């Protein structure tokens, strides 16, 4: 018994040392811009952008192969933050950032069979429900990646515009020329 425990411990320590040495030897340095972009992205790795996770999108943006608006779950705020980094440091053209309406999944409960394929596929656990029971989406947790829509066998899930609440609604900042012109006409 003691010999088995000692041999397993020695084997574990030896393999751990080999893994640590291999990690140091084969370490690949990532550019700092990729790390900056990855910090801004939501980190849900949903794949809605078409890249394998948020790090894949960050690498593509750093190389100039992906637009700053590729991350749909991040929305307008993430696109604006990425535009500042990518255009200044990578020299990529950000282009105009269109107003992206945040989307959420919606389940038609009369079509849902409770197969749980959407439940298993959701990266943020925004879908609730049990086996052979009707599922529903928690709108505050849904990021709009559409991963659940792809796997639904009965097409009971659709993507809808997220309803505006006091948390999500905002006014655009007024343009400086318009404010000055309206002040002059008022006087």
Swiss-Prot record:
Induction: Expression is reduced under iron-limiting conditions. One of its GO terms (biological process) is nitrogen fixation. SUPFAM superfamilies: 4Fe-4S ferredoxins. GO terms for molecular function: 4 iron, 4 sulfur cluster binding; electron transfer activity; metal ion binding. InterPro entries: 4Fe-4S_dom, 4Fe4S_Fe-S-bd, 4Fe4S_Fe_S_CS, 4Fe4S_Ferredoxin_RnfB, Elect_transpt_cplx_RnfB/RsxB, RnfB/RsxB_Proteobac. The keyword Membrane applies. Its main location: membrane. [4Fe-4S] cluster 2 binds at residues 112, 115, 118, 152. Its cofactor is [4Fe-4S] cluster. Its EC number is 7.-.-.-. It holds the Pfam family Fer4_21. It is a peripheral membrane protein. GO terms for cellular component: plasma membrane; plasma membrane-derived chromatophore membrane. Part of a membrane-bound complex that couples electron transfer with translocation of ions across the membrane. Required for nitrogen fixation. Involved in electron transfer to nitrogenase. Belongs to the 4Fe4S bacterial-type ferredoxin family. RnfB subfamily. The complex is composed of six subunits: RnfA, RnfB, RnfC, RnfD, RnfE and RnfG. This is Ion-translocating oxidoreductase complex subunit B. It comes from Rhodobacter capsulatus (Rhodopseudomonas capsulata). The lineage of its organism: Bacteria, Pseudomonadati, Pseudomonadota, Alphaproteobacteria, Rhodobacterales.
